[in-house]
Amino acid sequence: MDSNTVSSFQVDCFLWHVRKRFADQELGDAPFLDRLRRDQKSLRGRGSTLGLDIETATRAGKQIVERILEEESDEALKMTIASVPASRYLTDMTLEEMSRDWFMLMPKQKVAGSLCIRMDQAIMDKNIILKANFSVIFDRLETLILLRAFTEEGAIVGEISPLPSLPGHIDEDVKNAIGVLIGGLEWNDNTVRVSETLQRFAWRSSNEDGRPPLPPKQKRKMARTIESEV
């Protein structure tokens, strides 16, 4: 196993521990708590894949961070912070909408790279909107936290989420996953539109009503792809 992979996991575990202590003091805002919960799942998946104990890794990560801080001057820290571009966290969904459990009568699932696409194909003739929470840098989607499809009544009928064991995706991955989700939902005569935030940074639809321009052939192809890979 590559030593950089192990040490990266150890540092991530310790930094998550620090953030958790911060949140336990009720100091974190909604986006902070959002990322904390998602990163916990990611660390568990990585730990399982690597065969490493999280508690042991956290202790090792603490030693690595302490060694770095001992060598770090205040001036170097200021220069590092100034040179790193700042990302923005955008939210379509509330914390309740993100954390709510949901169930599917006819579950369909597809894994596309490091993203998992899930939908309930029992849903028919509904008006559906896609909402997402994600970070943006240089006016492009940086990291998808979670995307969900909601009916007008507020029911969750679809979802795109990063796989904890396979971190890392780009905006094109998210765009392709959105296309697959829309194709599957529109196969059952649902009307799907995308939130303004998603249109701007992830989908860039030219339609004024936020409906992505998917031709019928592409819809059918996407729906068949989901069915064939479940």
Curated annotation (Swiss-Prot):
Main localisation: host cell
Description of post-translational modifications: Upon interferon induction, ISGylated via host HERC5; this results in the impairment of NS1 interaction with RNA targets due to its inability to form homodimers and to interact with host EIF2AK2/PKR.
Gene Ontology CC, one term: host cell nucleus
Stretch list, region PABPN1-binding: 223-230
Region: Disordered, residue numbers: 205-230
InterPro entries: NS1, NS1A, NS1A_effect_dom-like_sf, uS15_NS1_RNA-bd_sf
UniProt keyword terms in alphabetical order: Eukaryotic host gene expression shutoff by virus, Host cytoplasm, Host gene expression shutoff by virus, Host mRNA suppression by virus, Host nucleus, Host-virus interaction, Inhibition of host innate immune response by virus, Inhibition of host interferon signaling pathway by virus, Inhibition of host PKR by virus, Inhibition of host pre-mRNA processing by virus, Inhibition of host RIG-I by virus, Inhibition of host RLR pathway by virus, Interferon antiviral system evasion, RNA-binding, Ubl conjugation, Viral immunoevasion
Domain of life: Viruses
MF terms (GO), sorted A to Z: protein serine/threonine kinase inhibitor activity; RNA binding
Gene Ontology terms describing biological process: symbiont-mediated suppression of host cytoplasmic pattern recognition receptor signaling pathway via inhibition of RIG-I activity; symbiont-mediated suppression of host gene expression; symbiont-mediated suppression of host mRNA processing; symbiont-mediated suppression of host PKR/eIFalpha signaling; symbiont-mediated suppression of host type I interferon-mediated signaling pathway
Residue window of motif Nuclear localization signal: 34-38
Sequence motif: Nuclear export signal, positions: 137-146
Keyword Ubl conjugation: yes
Residues covered by region (RNA-binding and homodimerization): 1-73
Domains (record comment): The dsRNA-binding region is required for suppression of RNA silencing.
Subunit structure: Homodimer. Interacts with host TRIM25 (via coiled coil); this interaction specifically inhibits TRIM25 multimerization and TRIM25-mediated RIGI CARD ubiquitination. Interacts with human EIF2AK2/PKR, CPSF4, IVNS1ABP and PABPN1.
Function: Inhibits post-transcriptional processing of cellular pre-mRNA, by binding and inhibiting two cellular proteins that are required for the 3'-end processing of cellular pre-mRNAs: the 30 kDa cleavage and polyadenylation specificity factor/CPSF4 and the poly(A)-binding protein 2/PABPN1. In turn, unprocessed 3' end pre-mRNAs accumulate in the host nucleus and are no longer exported to the cytoplasm. Cellular protein synthesis is thereby shut off very early after virus infection.
Protein name (database record): Non-structural protein 1
Organism the protein comes from: Influenza A virus (strain A/Turkey/Ontario/6118/1968 H8N4)
